[in-house]
Amino acid sequence: MSKFWSPFVKNLVPYVPGEQPKLTKLVKLNTNENPYGPSPRALAAMQAELNDNLRLYPDPNSDLLKQAVASYYGVQGNQVFLGNGSDEVLAHIFHGLLQQEKPLLFPDISYSFYPVYCGLYGIEHEAVPLDEQFQIRVADYARPNGGIIFPNPNAPTGCLLALDAVEQILKASPDSVVVVDEAYIDFGGQTAISLVDRYPNLLVTQTLSKSRSLAGLRVGLAVGHPDLIEALERVKNSFNSYPLDRLAIVGAAAAFEDREYFAKTCQQVIDSREWVVAQLQAKGFEVLPSAANFIFARHPRHDAAGLAAKLREQGVIVRHFKQQRIAQFLRISIGTQEQNQALIDGLGEL
């Protein structure tokens, strides 16, 4: 802490990202990256963009990518917002739409960036407890609020809220913005983007870091009513008019166009997830139902922190949270078959 820091900065509690180890020999199953590489079409598009044009600023509106997203989801271009990763998109949403008089609602076990944004932007909030099965209770959100946000599937649990339940939340709060954070939706869920034309208070966010294997590019998006998108554009252009670089724009657009590769790799992750679940259950683990590219598991006879340490000694990194209610769980990303086997072998006999 420095004497030059403002009182505001001194009171911030920043987000702690997952470990990015420098050792390349480790089996990295802690940050939910896709084990399969980006679309070859995306790589080719970025390679073609490595030319003299890099001396020029990128399109501030990222229209090429915006139209690719709009075409993919069957919406209009003015219903799409783009940012430098979904975290930046979420930051603009908190800043531009969720600073209200009434408290923002989100699950008590959820994406840990939400309370960080609330602290950054001075947003009053309430953490709504999940039920004993770590599911969202829809009725708990049917009360006065200044907005609602939740991941679907939830993170770090991986549990999915059905689309009709999402719609119940929307109907119960027609005067509040409801944000559905769909970072992992492509691994087993149905996107709420199909509802945006019926609910002007709905905003759906997604990322290209997970199902499209572009975590290194930092591309995120939101889809919603044009009025909501306009608010985000106003915030963006008061902060950074050029959030996406030229390589990110063309690479992400090509990734959306390569539907065959996308479908194939998503299915590979889903199939691998079911294999890992079966292997862990055979070792006595309790595994929550997952619609994501990770699983959330605990062993009734073994401490989670101890298991994480044991795996690390075997060269396998998983994520352990010390948060109340989930301190005995491990979040395990789905890797390649070789990585998944290393996980199971690393656990040994329990």
Curated annotation (Swiss-Prot):
Modified residues (N6-(pyridoxal phosphate)lysine): 210
Coiled-coil parts of chain: none
Pathway info: Amino-acid biosynthesis; L-histidine biosynthesis; L-histidine from 5-phospho-alpha-D-ribose 1-diphosphate: step 7/9
One Gene Ontology molecular-function label: histidinol-phosphate transaminase activity
Keywords: Amino-acid biosynthesis, Aminotransferase, Histidine biosynthesis, Pyridoxal phosphate, Transferase
Pfam families according to UniProt: Aminotran_1_2
Enzyme class: transferase
Cofactor: pyridoxal 5'-phosphate
Gene3D superfamilies on file: Aspartate Aminotransferase, domain 1, Type I PLP-dependent aspartate aminotransferase-like (Major domain)
EC number: 2.6.1.9
HAMAP family: HisC_aminotrans_2
NCBIfam families: hisC
Protein name: Histidinol-phosphate aminotransferase 1
Gene this chain is encoded by: hisC1
